[in-house]
């Protein structure tokens, strides 16, 4: 589980530190918006007009409103080439399909 944390923690920490507005899509399709106030192994505290504790197992996707620079300590570099800024989870597969056909 430590390997999964090596990408997740720096990404969430950069979003928290830079106070980047995020959209969080839950597995049931609900979209939550706000800023990440804090997080731990199991939950993210999302602040908007109120603070909400969101369990990570209920999250499908975290979409920042702007690009963030996050660095991982792993040897692979830590950034994902599959990240499409500004795309919603519903549009991601359509974008990948169009990129493959070009």
Curated annotation (Swiss-Prot):
Residues 9-68 form the Sm domain. GO terms for biological process: regulation of DNA-templated transcription; regulation of RNA stability; regulation of translation, ncRNA-mediated. Residues 70-96 have a biased composition (Polar residues). GO terms for molecular function: RNA binding. It comes from the Bacteria. GO terms for cellular component: cytosol. Residues 63-102 are annotated as: Disordered. It holds the Pfam family Hfq. Belongs to the Hfq family. This is RNA-binding protein Hfq. It comes from Shigella dysenteriae serotype 1 (strain Sd197).
